[in-house]
Amino acid sequence: MALNLQKKEEIICKIHETATRAVSVVVATLDGIAVNEVTKLRKEARDIGVCVHVIRNTLMRKVIENTPLACLREILTGQNIVAFSMNQPRDSARIFVKFTKNHEHFKIKGAVFEGKFIPASKINLLSDLPNHKEAIFRLITIMKTSSIGSLIHILHILSNQKQ
């Protein structure tokens, strides 16, 4: 269905607003995926704060023009689905990686995080990022472990010196 100029401008405006608020963006191919599967993916994504859009490449190019997402221009070929993480940077990558495991035709093309392009081969780096609570827990664990380890080491040295 052909879109008139006003509809295209509305779509560009809406997606541009989403793109500017997103903390990360992931692009994947949509070839060979049934509509009901895409609907399930969208619902699952919406539940964790990820906006998923199927948008024409020409419109997407206009959306990313003069933004940190401009590095996606080269991979916008064919039929694509774009996920915008609104809360945690890993969410869009994680949901696409999970979807890829069950759908062999679904291929991740790349992502953008903090203005840098992440190729599909390194998408697991983004999907494996800890969320805020996990990062704080890991930091506290490291701090506790290192301080206890230092104390044990000092006590061991002192006990060796006394003997």
Curated annotation (Swiss-Prot):
GO cellular component: ribonucleoprotein complex; ribosome
Record keyword Ubl conjugation present: no
Taxonomic placement: Bacteria, Pseudomonadati, Pseudomonadota, Gammaproteobacteria, Enterobacterales
GO-annotated molecular function: large ribosomal subunit rRNA binding
Family: Belongs to the universal ribosomal protein uL10 family.
Family annotation (CDD domains): Ribosomal_L10
Keywords: Ribonucleoprotein, Ribosomal protein, RNA-binding, rRNA-binding
Gene: rplJ
Purpose: Forms part of the ribosomal stalk, playing a central role in the interaction of the ribosome with GTP-bound translation factors.
RNA-binding as UniProt keyword: yes
Signal sequence annotation: none
Disulfide bonds: none
Protein name listed in UniProt: Large ribosomal subunit protein uL10
Biological processes, Gene Ontology terms: translation
Oligomer and partners: Part of the ribosomal stalk of the 50S ribosomal subunit. The N-terminus interacts with L11 and the large rRNA to form the base of the stalk. The C-terminus forms an elongated spine to which L12 dimers bind in a sequential fashion forming a multimeric L10(L12)X complex.
Gene3D superfamilies, per the entry: 3.30.70.1730
PANTHER family named among the record's database cross-references: 39S RIBOSOMAL PROTEIN L10, MITOCHONDRIAL
